Amino acid sequence: MAQAVVPAMQCRVGVKAAAGRVWSAGRTRTGRGGASPGFKVMAVSTGSTGVVPRLEQLLNMDTTPYTDKVIAEYIWVGGSGIDIRSKSRTISKPVEDPSELPKWNYDGSSTGQAPGEDSEVILYPQAIFKDPFRGGNNVLVICDTYTPQGEPLPTNKRHRAAQIFSDPKVGEQVPWFGIEQEYTLLQKDVNWPLGWPVGGFPGPQGPYYCAVGADKSFGRDISDAHYKACLYAGINISGTNGEVMPGQWEYQVGPSVGIEAGDHIWISRYILERITEQAGVVLTLDPKPIQGDWNGAGCHTNYSTKTMREDGGFEEIKRAILNLSLRHDLHISAYGEGNERRLTGKHETASIGTFSWGVANRGCSIRVGRDTEAKGKGYLEDRRPASNMDPYIVTGLLAETTILWQPSLEAEALAAKKLALKV
């Protein structure tokens, strides 16, 4: 099979996907005025000539030498609360801040967000990232959604999170988040995990976590392409690894401050959807894609405040754990659809109906690292969120519950006794 040639390509990842096709990734050359090169993931049909077809040449064309206009990809969360939608528009010149971009609209009746007789939904640009697919000065734009009257849609969870993070009490605490996004790759036409025999199962879990080798690691090229594309886009991605279940991967974003955490997770999910789309692989964030003795998929959220990170911060961590225990049901109800299939008390999870915490215990609701305990300061890990959670909801709730919400003294005392917390 011929290898596709990409002009001035500085890096390449190749995956054999099917006969007559080569999957490759590369960086295009720098454009006019020092415009950033673009990271490309391509499905290239190669015939006897081995020449990149004209369609691919057009897709990879750098327009910066020819025009100041740029393409802005407006991205928003759809009606299900987990689906990602986007559409493109031309902007007259490069932009550096979302305030430079116009509001836009779309047909909300086609996304389950508005009735047909009053279907217009307004997009408010909120954050911009470099576009790793188009390169140059083109941008990806995180938007939230409003009615024409300026009211946030019920699916606009960013609006409430922004209110929480703009509260002076929250701002003083400079909340940090490190989010571990797990996901599963599926074979397109059979909806079965990548690398698994169709209609069958691989060997038991054990050899696959952080593994290498064609018989143990499935989808590394997608994970690597996503990693590099996120770095290019300006996402604060901090790592990636193969997960316990074969065909499942994880990447980490953070530490991020406040609302930035949600923006970075949503844009990273969008980029991952685009890469899997081009690779002909299905991405699922289902928290338990395969029933049985297989790990589910979570979105563990590491969290700290300024007080937790300072000397003596472990006492503040314990106080936060106490508050979280008192609002366990509220958090569980907002931590992702289908999470009851994952939080069973098995496969490194706590039982969904019982709040628990522990040091270095991955079977607890809240885990505290040994390093945090030893230093007397640090962070906590909320292990309850599902892989399909909304990061705006989870980060906002963590800040609200641990900084703004005040339990009654009686409830606090009872919870402290139950959890053996001396606060």
Curated annotation (Swiss-Prot):
Instruction: State the Gene Ontology terms under molecular function.
Output: ATP binding; glutamine synthetase activity
Main location class: plastid
Question: Residue ranges of the GS beta-grasp domain?
Answer: 70-150
Q: From what superkingdom does this record's organism come?
A: Eukaryota
Q: What is its EC number?
A: 6.3.1.2
Q: What InterPro entries does the record tag this protein with? A: Gln_synt_N, Gln_synt_N_sf, Gln_synth/guanido_kin_cat_dom, Gln_synth_cat_dom, Gln_synth_gly_rich_site, Gln_synth_N_conserv_site, Glutamine_Synthetase
Which is a Gene Ontology cellular component entry for this protein? chloroplast
* Catalyses which reaction(s): L-glutamate + NH4(+) + ATP = L-glutamine + ADP + phosphate + H(+)
**Gene3D superfamilies with a match to the protein in the record:** Glutamine synthetase, N-terminal domain, Glutamine synthetase/guanido kinase, catalytic domain
Transit peptide (residue range): 1-51
Region spans: Disordered? 89-115
Biological process (GO) annotations held by this record are: glutamine biosynthetic process
Q: Name one Pfam family in it.
A: Gln-synt_N
Q: Which UniProt keywords apply?
A: ATP-binding, Chloroplast, Ligase, Nucleotide-binding, Plastid, Transit peptide
Localization recorded for this chain is: Plastid, Chloroplast
EC supergroup of this enzyme: ligase
| Occurrences of domain GS catalytic (ranges) | 154-423
- Described purpose of this protein according to its UniProt entry: The light-modulated chloroplast enzyme, encoded by a nuclear gene and expressed primarily in leaves, is responsible for the reassimilation of the ammonia generated by photorespiration.
Q: Which family does it belong to?
A: Belongs to the glutamine synthetase family.
Q: How does it assemble?
A: Homooctamer.
* Record's protein name: Glutamine synthetase, chloroplastic
